[in-house]
């Protein structure tokens, strides 16, 4: 697909926390969404030529896009970053902003935003 359409943005709920920084409790290695094989898949996907736009611009920021409805997780910020805007490598230098709208409370997930500065 990337050969036919080299400039891709693939956004959505991947249901995986890629790195320890993406989950409130990195000791949860045996829980679906943070299993080693899921994290390996995500790493392989990124290595295939995609950029995690949020992490590219926010290397140290610990923010989440999902909170369980149980145990008052959102109020206690016990979240997971499961939602991604993956950008193909040719668009990497076009990423101008990437952020999470964590104040939006319409769902257990909140919106993510990526802004690309593309010259037409």
What residues fall within each predicted segment?
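Metal-dependent phosphoesterases centered on the DNase I-like endonuclease/exonuclease/phosphatase
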Residues: 1-78, 82
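Short acidic, gly/pro-rich beta-turn/loop elements at beta-sheet edges
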Residues: 22, 96, 108
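Hydrophobic/anchoring residues in structured secondary elements
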Residues: 55, 97-100
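Hydrophobic alpha-helical positions that pack around
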Residues: 86
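Short helix-loop capping/hinge motifs at secondary-structure junctions, enriched
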Residues: 91-94
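Surface polyanion/phosphate-binding segment centered on an Asp-His-Pro turn
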Residues: 99-120
């Amino acid at each position: 697909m990337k050969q036919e359409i080299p400039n891709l943005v693939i956004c959505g709920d991947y249901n995986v926390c890629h790195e320890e920084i993406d989950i409130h409790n990195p000791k949860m290695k045996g829980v679906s969404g943070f299993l080693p094989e899921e994290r390996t898949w995500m790493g392989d996907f990124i290595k295939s030529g995609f950029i995690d736009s949020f992490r590219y611009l926010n290397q140290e920021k610990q923010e989440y896009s999902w909170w369980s409805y149980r145990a008052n997780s959102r109020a206690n910020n016990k979240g997971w970053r499961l939602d991604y805007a993956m950008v193909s490598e040719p668009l990497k230098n076009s990423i101008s902003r990437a952020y999470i709208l964590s104040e939006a409370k319409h769902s257990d997930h909140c919106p993510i935003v990526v802004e690309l500065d593309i010259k037409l």
